């Protein structure tokens, strides 16, 4: 006659901690196994762990000024606080980063403004 799993669980449930400890030792001796916790290997290299985490800092890159360069220059000045010449140089030198190390909301806001002005933008 085979013993059902439920019967075994009921028997274990009624045991004291000392009796459970003795049962574990008996299993270790009988089957040649160890009840020690298995060490789980960590991720290989730090790059894999960093890639799994959500990115918190973004860079808004002006890929291309588009047809309406004047509007893009105004948007760049508004976002960065640069002077006219500096903003024009940035737009003329595209692709260039407009904002670096900003959070996701600020990056999306900057991208939206620049795209509305006619620029092609990437968020990295």
UniProtKB/Swiss-Prot annotation:
Instruction: Name the domain of life this protein comes from.
Output: Bacteria
What processes in GO biological process is this protein linked to? translation
Biological role = Forms part of the ribosomal stalk which helps the ribosome interact with GTP-bound translation factors. Is thus essential for accurate translation.
Q: Subunit notes for this chain?
A: Homodimer. Part of the ribosomal stalk of the 50S ribosomal subunit. Forms a multimeric L10(L12)X complex, where L10 forms an elongated spine to which 2 to 4 L12 dimers bind in a sequential fashion. Binds GTP-bound translation factors.
Q: Tell me which family the UniProt entry assigns to this protein.
A: Belongs to the bacterial ribosomal protein bL12 family.
Please name the InterPro entries in this protein's record.
Ribosomal_bL12 (IPR000206), Ribosomal_bL12_C (IPR013823), Ribosomal_bL12_C/ClpS-like (IPR014719), Ribosomal_bL12_oligo (IPR008932), Ribosomal_bL12_oligo_N_sf (IPR036235)
- The species is Burkholderia cenocepacia (strain HI2424)
Write one Gene Ontology MF term.
structural constituent of ribosome
What is the recorded name of this protein? Large ribosomal subunit protein bL12
Provide the disulphide bond pattern.
none
What cellular component GO annotations does this protein have?
cytosolic large ribosomal subunit
- Supply the Pfam families for this chain: Ribosomal_L12, Ribosomal_L12_N
Upper classification of the organism: Bacteria, Pseudomonadati, Pseudomonadota, Betaproteobacteria, Burkholderiales
Question: Which keywords does this Swiss-Prot/TrEMBL entry list?
Answer: Ribonucleoprotein, Ribosomal protein
């Amino acid at each position: 006659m085979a013993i059902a799993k439920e019967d075994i669980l009921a028997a274990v449930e009624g045991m004291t901690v000392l009796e459970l400890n003795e049962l574990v030792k008996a299993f270790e001796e009988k089957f040649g196994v160890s009840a020690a916790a298995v060490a789980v290997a960590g991720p290989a290299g730090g790059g894999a762990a960093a890639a799994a985490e959500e990115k918190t800092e973004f860079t808004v890159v002006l890929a291309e000024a588009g047809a309406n360069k004047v509007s893009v220059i105004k948007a760049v000045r508004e976002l960065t606080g640069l002077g006219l010449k500096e903003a024009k140089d940035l737009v003329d030198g595209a692709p260039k980063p407009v904002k670096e190390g900003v959070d996701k909301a600020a990056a999306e806001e900057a991208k939206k403004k620049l795209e509305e002005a006619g620029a092609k933008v990437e968020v990295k």
